């Protein structure tokens, strides 16, 4: 909901707003990301998991390139729209890989599902912190904190270690979000 609303606002503003520099920087990549998004929905709906992962990777790469191109912008709407979108797709890509592994009944190389979940949370946290810093975009972290909060709520009754890991990861990402906003105001 929020991502599509922000993307809709981006579409409206690009026609109404006086600042077209950011729109030109993004260029055709926005259309590419939209095509990948639509294809992913179709692949996921029809449970074409290997294909859905490939399409998701295409979406992820297109969003990375968009975020590279807008790293220097001060336009908050553009940073928020594509930052939140990238953060969500980073986490969704990890979830898509996990779904594919479960589909193929991967045994986790002898490591428990609980430990693998903790590892995936930590990988998501590290990728998010690096992305916030690389793209100078604190918005990337917001959807990741949201995802980690969802994990905490879902797992609170059964896996305390997962809940604690997700909470710590959310706090660390939150720290970098705040730090990035502060640095943006005081360069």
Residue ranges and their predicted role:
Residues 40-53, 71-76, 104-111, 131-135, ...:
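Membrane-interface helix caps and helix-loop-helix hairpins in membrane proteins
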Residues 15-16, 69-71, 177-187:
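Membrane-interface capping segments at transmembrane-helix boundaries
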Residues 29-41, 55-66, 80-98:
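Alpha-helical transmembrane segments of multi-pass integral membrane proteins
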Residues 110-126, 152-174:
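Membrane-interface transmembrane-helix boundary segments in multi-pass integral membrane proteins
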Residues 78-87, 106-120:
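A loop-to-helix transmembrane entry motif
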Residues 139-150:
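Central hydrophobic cores of alpha-helical transmembrane segments
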Residues 57-68, 148-151, 170-177:
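Alpha-helical transmembrane segments and their membrane-interface exit regions
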Residues 1-53:
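Early transmembrane hairpin module of multi-pass membrane proteins
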């Amino acid at each position: 909901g929020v991502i599509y609303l922000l993307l809709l606002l981006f579409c409206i503003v690009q026609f109404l707003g006086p600042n077209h520099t950011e729109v030109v920087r993004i260029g055709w990549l926005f259309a590419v990301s939209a095509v990948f998004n639509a294809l992913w929905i179709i692949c996921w709906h029809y449970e074409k998991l290997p294909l859905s992962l490939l399409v998701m990777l295409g979406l992820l790469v297109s969003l990375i390139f968009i975020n590279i191109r807008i790293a220097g912008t001060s336009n908050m709407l553009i940073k928020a729209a594509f930052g939140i979108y990238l953060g969500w797709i980073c986490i969704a890509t990890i979830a898509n890989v996990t779904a594919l592994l479960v589909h193929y009944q991967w045994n986790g190389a002898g490591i428990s599902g609980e430990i693998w979940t903790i590892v995936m949370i930590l990988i998501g946290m590290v990728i998010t912190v690096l992305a916030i810093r690389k793209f100078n975009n604190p918005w990337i972290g917001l959807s990741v904190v949201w995802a980690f909060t969802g994990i905490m709520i879902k797992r609170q009754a059964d896996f305390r270690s997962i809940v604690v890991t997700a909470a710590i990861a959310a706090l660390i990402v939150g720290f970098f979000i705040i730090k990035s906003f502060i640095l943006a105001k005081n360069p």
